[in-house]
Amino acid sequence: MSTEQDIKTEEQIPLTYAAVAAPTVQTEGEAVVAPEEPKPKKNWFTFGKKKAAPTDETNIEEGGAPGDEPVKEKKEKKCWWSRCQKGEGEQKEENIAIGVDLVNRDANSMNNHVQLNFEDIFGEADSQHSWDCVWRLNHTVFTAVRLFIYRLVSLLALPFTIIFAIFFGLLASINVFIIVPLGKLLSIPGTLLAKLWNWLIHAIFDPIASAVGLIFSNFNIRKYGINQETTAPCV
């Protein structure tokens, strides 16, 4: 019986059994370690050299060679006069960052009387119009010249700004450190003197004055003329 069972089990084994490799089990000690790349040796003649820049994939996609340097975007050069001219958006951003309002420079509306434009000064009647180019040129020239003169004078007025800053600083320091402390110091005896004077007026002088007024309130004064005739009483 045993021989027949062995023959049956051998017949049931598939033919590909020998071709299938047994799974290999790796333990923790037998883990495969990747070989380390040898580090380049530093010599005295290669110490100051920089490493080669890595190739840019975007440069290769655009059609450049792998060894070529990456293409850098060119920045627009700004002239010195264009740096002073900033848009309203940039001024608002600087206002948020710095705290100086460069857009609304008259927040308290102190100089609304000088806020005059070309339309507030010049005007043509409906019956008489100049050429459009002439009117446009006058508007441009007036605005540009007025702005240039104002900026030039404001630059020349910098010494006056310094002088007024000195005056305001002196007056503010005198007010803070001398006048206000002196006023607070004098308010202590001044309060006592005010209370004493109020008591003297209401307690002594007021009754005396009211009594004298009641005494002399019934007196009548009559004025006589030259012929000793009585006239109307003068009250």
Curated annotation (Swiss-Prot):
This is Caveolin-1. One of its GO terms (cellular component) is cell cortex. Keywords: Cell membrane, Golgi apparatus, Lipoprotein, Membrane, Palmitate. GO terms for biological process: caveola assembly; meiotic cell cycle; Ras protein signal transduction; regulation of egg-laying behavior. Residues 162-182 dip into the membrane without crossing it. InterPro entries: Caveolin. One of its GO terms (molecular function) is molecular adaptor activity. It is a peripheral membrane protein. It comes from Caenorhabditis elegans. Residues 29-72 are annotated as: Disordered. Residues 1-161, 183-235 are cytoplasmic. Homooligomer containing 14-16 monomers per oligomer. The gene is cav-1. May act as a scaffolding protein within caveolar membranes. Interacts directly with G-protein alpha subunits and can functionally regulate their activity. A lipid is attached at residue 234 (S-palmitoyl cysteine). Belongs to the caveolin family. Its main location: Golgi. It holds the Pfam family Caveolin. It is found in: Golgi apparatus membrane; Cell membrane; Membrane, Caveola.
